[in-house]
Amino acid sequence: MRRCALLFRLFLISYSCSVYFSACTQASSLKEPDEELPRAEQWDDNGKRILQADDPEHIRTEERGITQNLKPAAESIGKVKAAGKAIKTSVLNSKLMNWVKTALRKGYTAWQLVKMYSLSKGGGVSAMMSGITPLTYKTVYGRTIASKVDVKEKFDTFKTEYFKLFEDLDNVKPSSGMQYWDDELKKLPWTRQFTARLALNKVRKILKSDPSVEKMIDLNVSPLLYMRALEKQGAFARNDVAAINKLKDYVKAFKKHVDLA
């Protein structure tokens, strides 16, 4: 009987101890809720560790990705601002260039008027030798002179005198009449001689590229200086049929263009 009572007491003591230690463990876990629990690492098929959502390395990787994504956006904004400034600058430059071109065009027209008026005092020869053509006369005077009747009379006279120079182009070699122009050139003041030589050199430079008839009309190439340039090149002396025929075609096309202008 005593033995049973002793065993019962030992059972109660052991049960009380187990309850006490269990309560202490629970209290300890409640006091330290922020203690980090061991992580269960995961690995992929290639042996590379898979980062968890709350892994510090995973967080740093996401932060780097956000930074890398923000950089192109910032660069794009900078490029847009730079493009806007470039557009404003180009518009300003375009307006400035248009103003400069307009001023130069008006200045060139005024200079042409003074030049033609000065040359007309020395006779039609001086004007023709300097590269003035009926098309030049009609274009410049027709746009700027108020007295259209006076312009019409002067233009018709100049045009008639000009194209008479080519009436014998099919019958007589132009080289036979070139000496006349050389003699007339020597009679001019040195300033007009210089102007005439510049005009002739300009035509000779254009002819080196073998332009079409239409291109020469657009450039207002003087048929007289064209003929003089061929003579200087020896085209008439060696009877260069192709070059001479092209000159004839140009004179006809130029006259037709002047009539229609």
UniProtKB/Swiss-Prot annotation:
UniProt keywords, alphabetically: Host cell membrane, Host membrane, Membrane, Secreted, Signal, Virulence
Keyword Membrane applies: yes
Major location category of this protein: secreted
CC annotations in GO: extracellular region; host cell plasma membrane; membrane
Motif RxLR-dEER per UniProt: ranges: 49-64
Subcellular location(s) of the protein: Secreted; Host cell membrane
Highest taxon of source: Eukaryota
Descriptive protein name: Secreted RxLR effector protein 154
Species of origin: Plasmopara viticola (Downy mildew of grapevine)
Taxonomic lineage from the root: Eukaryota, Sar, Stramenopiles, Oomycota, Peronosporales
Gene: RXLR154
